[in-house]
């Protein structure tokens, strides 16, 4: 009996119903709530699990390299990146007979394969990989790192190698090592790789371990570094006629500031990127020596925070007390980390398409669309998670005595003002944006499109002009040839930048108009409403006027019975749950906007977006309906084609999504009655009644059913859009 699942909770293990299984799974990672947990074991478990996480990541990336080397067409793709379709891996067992085999045999393969829309081919090519052997050795190296990570994780669970709590709470040492080691040495090493391997590779030189020490990355070697003539490293860059991967038109520079894109690959100059990474490395190596550890020099973070008291008195005691609050709360730290990572992931989405770093990726339209959408959805989940852990911090870790009148306490003190302002902003954005869209819909329906309300985004256009975009006719900053900013950069990076920003074939500073203005505000509505729900959930997590003792009920509770009247739906978990729907909704609008604008750009008919995006029917008809035709035609009486799998996934995604509502709309009582009826039938059916269960079947709790519903809604929503996106883009552009 003692070994029943879950072993971490004897109370749950003795539960006679199926609740034991579901609650066991739900709390498996909530180490804080486990029996016999101590602060020391909590920190050590989390630390060891990080190594397991790393092992999984290394194994997964190793698998990418291995399968492309084994079943892909990397070597033939390298010969002609623009016309050969990159293969991700083979399809072992194509169903649906000969038509399926023919439909999926492409990219020069002998049998059915999947095409890669992840951009790994472009990435590996840019960083200097050229042969299948290179890919295999990369896969082996990552496999080795994966094994090392597993060993390290196991090692740090052994008594002798378990770090103490004081080691985990040594913030200065951790910051120094992460800043210098992670963000300093890593970019420095990457600069080294770019300079020694990738840049020579882009100029037709094949540098590997066997000739690594013989090939000079720069004709003058380290001379300019030691004599202080660093500008020599920037002289003689690749010419605009350079053919990537060959010596034709190649220069000798290794660290440049050219600006703009390589004309052939439409990606940032490798020498610019090497320079960028060197600068980042320098900054963080310095930053990693700022905090006081063994030698009594440098800053103490506690002293810094305690000194942050604005003299005006309008922020009370400022940051006093924050050091211990943050350093003793894993949820606070996780919230900060997730907030940062979420923002960075969204920035990755924005920059991967506008400033592509990998050779030829800008011309692989389906990959561009897939990467943008992927990173925006990931960012959404990570950002909502930040607020979830912020709320858990307020419930489990926040100590009012330690934080009297500091910025954290003052956030709680004026939460009504914060929440009501967010509410006002959301209402304003929602009603005005919908009002404009609906007005325009009605005008088109009545045949008077000239009566639409179309607002030019003049402030955004002015900002684009300030960065050098000339098409709007604003004579300002970098688009004004007489300004000091223009003249200062003219000799170095500006020509490349101006050329790129005014070139209409890339995605840098796209021309915007009334359709962009409207969808921008629709997205702003989604962002503000999501933020409102999340912020309210965190700030009301400890208590509210309606339920002052809320923190005593924990992070997720369904209600406090009928007696209090109206305590359903107000736990911090419920706020997270509602916010995820809004987050998905908002990112839907973001990705619709990005995809439609780019489809029209790539097809050369931007007027379709400009004319149809100003009213809702335009979005429904000319984006969603028009582009789903490939999916609806994925299989027909004439047999299969290569889009059939996406057509099936589109249907399957809708099915998963719709299943979510089964959990979201009907509550416990309905399911409990149904379960009891089914159990009755089971016990009275011959043969079936030979199978017994140890746990009495009961319905999911309200909170659990919501989680299951939300999971199906989210997964179905993303599956459906992924199939739509890839099929509609690859169906047009291959």
From Swiss-Prot:
Record's cofactor remark: P700 is a chlorophyll a/chlorophyll a' dimer, A0 is one or more chlorophyll a, A1 is one or both phylloquinones and FX is a shared 4Fe-4S iron-sulfur center.
Membrane topology: Multi-pass membrane protein
Annotated residues for binding of chlorophyll a B3: 662, 670
Membrane-traversing stretches: 46-69, 135-158, 175-199, 273-291, 330-353, 369-395, 417-439, 517-535, 575-596, 643-665, 707-727
Enzyme category, top tier: oxidoreductase
Record-level GO cellular component terms: chloroplast thylakoid membrane; photosystem I
Predominant localisation class: plastid
InterPro entries: PSI_PsaA/B (IPR001280), PSI_PsaA/B_CS (IPR020586), PSI_PsaA/B_sf (IPR036408), PSI_PsaB (IPR006244)
Keywords in alphabetical order: 4Fe-4S, Chlorophyll, Chloroplast, Chromophore, Electron transport, Iron, Iron-sulfur, Magnesium, Membrane, Metal-binding, Oxidoreductase, Photosynthesis, Photosystem I, Plastid, Thylakoid, Transmembrane, Transmembrane helix, Transport
Chain residues that bind [4Fe-4S] cluster: 559, 568
Binding site for chlorophyll a B1: 654
HAMAP family named in the record: PSI_PsaB
Name of the protein in question: Photosystem I P700 chlorophyll a apoprotein A2
Taxonomic lineage of the native organism: Eukaryota, Viridiplantae, Streptophyta, Embryophyta, Tracheophyta
